[in-house]
Amino acid sequence: MLEDTTIHNAITDKALSSYFRSSGNLLEEESAVLGQAVTNLMLSGDNVNNKNIILSLIHSLETTNDILKADVIRKTLEIVLRYTADDM
């Protein structure tokens, strides 16, 4: 996976990026999930915007069989959606 700085710089929503960056260890698992989603988007050549992050997280949520991982993905999705409400 890419470095945290690269991941945060790739996110077009700077408020969302700042929120995760300033959360420290509080959102460590959620940051890892977000980082994986951003990395996947970057590697596939897609734009790293809230819409694509949301779609990536939904896909991850739909395809995981791990209940604990699904909970972390859901929490990450809720955070991203909170920062996207104005865009809808």
Swiss-Prot record:
Pfam family, one: YmgB
GO biological processes: cellular response to acidic pH
Top-level taxon of the source organism: Bacteria
Record's keyword terms, sorted: DNA-binding
UniProt xrefs under InterPro entries: AriR
GO MF terms held by the record: DNA binding
Subunit structure comment from the entry: Homodimer.
Family: Belongs to the AriR family.
Job of this protein: Regulates expression of genes involved in acid-resistance and biofilm formation. May be a non-specific DNA-binding protein that binds genes and/or intergenic regions via a geometric recognition.
Protein name: Regulatory protein AriR
Lineage summary: Bacteria, Pseudomonadati, Pseudomonadota, Gammaproteobacteria, Enterobacterales
Gene name of this polypeptide: ariR
